[in-house]
Amino acid sequence: MNIPYISAEEVRKNLSMEDAIQCTENVYKLKSQDKTVVWPTIFYEFDPGHADMDIKSGYLPEQHIFGHKMVAFMEANVQKGLPDLVGLIAVFSSETGMPLGLVDGSSVTGMRAGAAGAIGAKYLARKNSQNALIVGTGNQAPFQIAALLKVFPTLETIRIANPHNEGHAAVFASKIRAMLQTDFAIEAASVTFEGVSDLQEAVSDSDIIITITPSHTPLIQKEWVKPGTHFSCIGADMAGKEEIDSQIFEDVIVFVDDLEHCRNAGEIEIPLKQGTLSEDRICGELGDLILGKAAGRKSDTDITVFDSTGMALLDLAVADFLLKKNR
């Protein structure tokens, strides 16, 4: 049996950020219409904080596909000259059970997670937003910035913070313009990129904040946040992770990608357990907002949060798009 395989290089050549955003937004809408199935995540830590893996799976009936994505994070790979994030997506026919193809997982993860953060901002942030803050300088950061510029091309300033090493943020900020051009064909000549030395000041001046760290302790405090701010919380994808102060959830508009997963392993997990967020104040899943089944931002002073743990459905949709394009 000859099973098609799409490498990371082929993903980069054949998948635009516009494609990733379209695939991702379509999945959110299908999920809101009960046209998807998400199965429980399998997670295991080989060395807590340094080496772990997860397997996420799902079913897209309209595309007649099911499958899974396995991703492993191996911090020590950097010293071995290997990528620290390794993954593989397997796509199967739901009509025959036959494998349709394999796709590199890490490159697709970057694109669809970037798309998720940006779509959350598209539907919840103020339309006149000018300043954005990206908290985290890891693999995800370029994808988040590229996707955000696709849905907010009028952004004036994008600040980048590494809460544990401001030097990394400065270096990243100096390189990101060239990365956007080379990797995403995005011209960002009118955007100012800045490395952050004072996180509190940067938070207080930001309209859109995207968090993409593996933090288990809050990095952003409630008193730093100005009225009208939007958060796309992408990093908290396993139980115990927390990027923003749970007190922020006392008076916010909250949407999630998958309610069950976010309850157990998203940014809302700890606020729900602590009681700073109640179930009845979760407005719905993002697809509900996109389809007009739920109300989002009501005023320019509302603080909004999109909690995304990530779903295999997104990976499968993007992988299916690539496999069909490659036939």
Question: What spans do the regions from the language model cover?
Answer:
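NAD(P)-binding Rossmann-fold cofactor-contacting core
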Residues: V151-A185
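N-terminal ligand-binding/catalytic initiation module
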Residues: M1-G110, A116-A118, A125-N128, G284, ...
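Residues that mark the start of a beta-strand
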Residues: Q130-N131, T157, D302
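Adenosine-phosphate binding glycine-rich loop
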Residues: E10, A239-R327
